[in-house]
Amino acid sequence: MRKGVLKDPEIADLFYKDDPEELFIGLHEIGHGSFGAVYFATNAHTSEVVAIKKMSYSGKQTHEKWQDILKEVKFLRQLKHPNTIEYKGCYLKEHTAWLVMEYCLGSASDLLEVHKKPLQEVEIAAITHGALHGLAYLHSHALIHRDIKAGNILLTEPGQVKLADFGSASMASPANSFVGTPYWMAPEVILAMDEGQYDGKVDIWSLGITCIELAERKPPLFNMNAMSALYHIAQNDSPTLQSNEWTDSFRRFVDYCLQKIPQERPTSAELLRHDFVRRDRPLRVLIDLIQRTKDAVRELDNLQYRKMKKILFQETRNGPLNESQEDEEDSEHGTSLNREMDSLGSNHSIPSMSVSTGSQSSSVNSMQEVMDESSSELVMMHDDESTINSSSSVVHKKDHVFIRDEAGHGDPRPEPRPTQSVQSQALHYRNRERFATIKSASLVTRQIHEHEQENELREQMSGYKRMRRQHQKQLIALENKLKAEMDEHRLKLQKEVETHANNSSIELEKLAKKQVAIIEKEAKVAAADEKKFQQQILAQQKKDLTTFLESQKKQYKICKEKIKEEMNEDHSTPKKEKQERISKHKENLQHTQAEEEAHLLTQQRLYYDKNCRFFKRKIMIKRHEVEQQNIREELNKKRTQKEMEHAMLIRHDESTRELEYRQLHTLQKLRMDLIRLQHQTELENQLEYNKRRERELHRKHVMELRQQPKNLKAMEMQIKKQFQDTCKVQTKQYKALKNHQLEVTPKNEHKTILKTLKDEQTRKLAILAEQYEQSINEMMASQALRLDEAQEAECQALRLQLQQEMELLNAYQSKIKMQTEAQHERELQKLEQRVSLRRAHLEQKIEEELAALQKERSERIKNLLERQEREIETFDMESLRMGFGNLVTLDFPKEDYR
C-alpha cells in the first residue's frame, strides 16, 4: 500500500480529513530540524494559535518516515497532562503530515541563546520540577521520552513547562533502540544493542545532563565530535557541575540523576521528593524569566531593525553613511543593549561563551559544533507576501516571519522606496512585534541556515543511527526466526511424544482386550472341560453301577442256585421250612446287595463331588496362572513403552541441545558480524571526520595565507603612517630649531647653521628610513613566523585532538568487543547450565518413572498373588467344610478330564 493512502480504518482514524492549507492560515516558520519545519499558524475557524510540525514522508526511507509519523501521532494522542505538549490533531497533505500542537513561546535552550549566560539555580529548579512532573506521568504509563534536553523543554506564556518532541519516544518499557541526541544519551542507550534493554531511567540521565546544560550553557563534551562523545559517555565516569558556586542540593541532584548504573539511578517520582525541586522559590520565577527574555528578544530585533534602516538610507542616498557616524550610532545602540543584557538573567560569574545549542526538535541538529555568533548577526528575510500564502502545498523554506502582539516601532519620517529584498528585511523586524516569543529572529534564521547547509556530521550521525536500528532489526528478525524454529521443533517433539503416548495407550488397550478375550476363552474352555469331566465321571459311574448291578444279579443267581442245591441236598428239612429259609436268604441277599448298591452310589457321589471340586481348584489355579501371565505381559509392555519413551526423550533432549547450541552460535555470529560492521563504520566515520577537520583547517590556513598580504599591507601602511607622522614631527622640530638658531646666531653664521641643520635633518631622516625599512622587515618576518607558528600549533592541536578521539574510539570498540565476548561467554555458560540442569531433571524423571513403574509392578503382582492366595484359601476352607480334606494331593482317575 502506498503510504498516505489510508485503507486501514485504524490508521485512518489517526488523521483528520480537513485540508490543512485551508484550515490554518498565516503560517510562519519558527523552527527547523532534520524532520522538517515548525510553523506558527492560526486556525481559520476558531482563531486559535497553534504550532504545526510538518513532516514529509516521501523520498528516501519512505516506509521508516511513515512509521515514525504513525508512532508519534499514536504517542501524542494518549498524552493528557499539564506538563506535556497538548496535541490538537494531524492532517495529511501531499505526502506531508501536519502535526498540530499547542503554541509555546520557545524552549529552555532559547533562554540560553538569548541571554548568553547560564540560568539562575532557582530558574533551573523550576524548569526541572515541571519537566519531572511530565516524566513521572510518562513513566507511570510505561512510556519513555528518550530525547530530554533543553531544546525539548518548552515554556508557555503563563510559565508552564511542557515536554515536547516525542519523535524518539518509546511506547514500551523496557526498550532497546539506539535513539536520542548523542550528548544527552544515557550510557545504557548507547550500549542498548550490545548489552540489553533500558527503561525510563534513561530520561533521568538526560535530565541530569540538561541541568548541566542550563547551568553551563552547553552539555558536557559539547566541544567534542558527537561520535566521540558517544564513546566517551559509554566508558568514562559521569559528568559533574564544574563551577563551585552552585549549592550542594543542586550538585547532589545532578549527581543523583547521573548515576552510571541504572539500578542506582532514581525514578522520576523519587526525584520529585528531592530538596532541590521542593525548596521554596518565587511563584513568578518562570514568568519573570520569560518576560525578561521577551524584552531582550525585542531589543535584539530592534537592533537588527535599525541596522536594516541604515542599509535602506544608504541605498536611498546612493552612498554609505559616514564611517564615524555609523560607528557612533552602533556604539550607542550596542551600549544600550549591553546595559540591558547586564541587567538580565543570572548573576553567576561563569564566563559567557557563545554556544548555540538551538531548540530544534530534532535529536540530530543538537550535534552542531559551537557556532560563531557573528555569523548570524545579520539576518536576511523575505516579506509577508511569500509567507502568508497558505494555499500553496509547500511553504517556502524561508517563510519565517514573526508577528508580535505589541505595536511595532514606527518612524514618522517618510522613507524612500528601497529595493525589494532590503525592504523585506526591514519589514520583517517590524512584523515580528505582533506575537510573543522568546526566540530571536537571528536564532530562527541560523537554524534554517544550518539545516539548509550540507551538514556532513548530521548525515553521518543519521546514517549511524539508521545502521544501529537496522542491526537491531536484523537481530530481532533472527531472534524471531530462531524462536519460531525452536517453537516448531518443540511442537514437533511434543507431537512425537503425544503420538507415542497415544500409540502406547492404544497398544495397552489392545493388550487389555486381548487378555480379556483370552480369559473369556479360557473360562469357556474351562466350563466345557468341567462339563465334559462331569459327564465322563457320571458315564463311568453309570457304567460301574451297571456292571455292579449285573454282578449282583449274577451273584444273586449263583447264591440262589447254591441255596437251592443245598436245600435240595438236605432232605431232612421240610419243604415249607426250606421255602422260608430260601426266602429269608433271598431277603438277606437282596438287602446286602441293596446296601452295597447304596454304598456304591454314595461312594460315586462323593467321588464325583470331590473330583469336581478338585477340577474347579485346578481351573482356578490355571486362571490364576493366566492372570499372572497377563499382568506380567502388561507390566512388561508398560516397561518397554516407558523405556522407548525415555529413549525418545533423551533423543529429543540431545536434538534440542544441538539446536540450542546451533542457534546461539548463529545469533552470536550475527552479533559479532554486526559489531564488526558497526566498528568498521565507526572507524570510517572517524577517519572521514578527521579528513574533514584537516581539510577545514587547511582551507582556513590557505585563507589566512591569502589574507596575509592584505594584513601585511595594512600593517605596512600603519608603519608608513607612523613614519610619516614622525617625519612631520621632525620637520616641525627642524623648522622650530632652525628659526630658534637663526634668531640666536649672527647672520653671517646662518649659512653654516642651515647647512649643519640640513645635514642633521638628512641624517635623522636616513635613520628613520632605516628604522622604517627595518620595522617593515621585522614586521614581515614576525607576522610570517607568527602565522607559521600559529598554524603549526593549530595543526599540532588538531592532530592531538584527533589522535585522542581515535584512541577513545579504539578503547570504546575494545570495550564493546570485550563486553560482547563476555556476554557471549555468559550466554554459553547459561545455556550449558540450562542444558545440564534439563538433562539432570530428565534423568531424575526417568529414574523416578522407572522406580514408580517397578513399584507399581511389585504392588500389582503382590496384590494379585495375595488375592489369588486368599481365593485359594477360601476355596480350600470351603472344601474342608464340605469334608473333602486336602485336595492338593488328590489323584485323578486314569482319564484326564482337564
From Swiss-Prot:
Impact reported for residue 256 to F: Enhances IL2 production by T cells and increases JNK phosphorylation
Subcellular location: Cytoplasm; Cell membrane; Membrane raft; Lipid droplet
Primary location recorded for the protein, binned into one broad class: cytoplasm
Record-linked SMART domains: S_TKc
Tissue specificity statement from the Swiss-Prot or TrEMBL entry: Ubiquitously expressed at a low level, and highly expressed in peripheral blood leukocytes (PBLs), thymus, spleen, kidney, skeletal muscle, heart and liver.
EC primary class: transferase
Region feature (Disordered): 316-362, 405-425, 565-596
Biased composition (Low complexity): 352-362
Active site per UniProt: 147
Annotated catalysed reactions: L-seryl-[protein] + ATP = O-phospho-L-seryl-[protein] + ADP + H(+); L-threonyl-[protein] + ATP = O-phospho-L-threonyl-[protein] + ADP + H(+)
A GO MF term: protein kinase inhibitor activity
PROSITE patterns: PROTEIN_KINASE_ATP, PROTEIN_KINASE_DOM, PROTEIN_KINASE_ST
UniProt feature, compositional bias: Polar residues: 334-351
Keywords: Acetylation, ATP-binding, Cell membrane, Coiled coil, Cytoplasm, DNA damage, DNA repair, Kinase, Lipid droplet, Membrane, Nucleotide-binding, Phosphoprotein, Serine/threonine-protein kinase, Transferase
Modified sites of kind Phosphoserine: 324, 331, 343, 346, 349, 359, 442
Family indicated by similarity: Belongs to the protein kinase superfamily. STE Ser/Thr protein kinase family. STE20 subfamily.
Subunit structure of this chain's protein: Self-associates. Interacts with ERN1 and TRAF2. Interaction with TRAF2 is facilitated under ER stress conditions, such as treatment with tunicamycin, and may promote TRAF2 phosphorylation. Interacts (via N-terminus) with STK25; the interaction promotes STK25 abundance at the level of protein expression and/or stability.
Protein name, as recorded: Serine/threonine-protein kinase TAO3
The organism of origin for this protein: Homo sapiens
Gene responsible for this protein: TAOK3
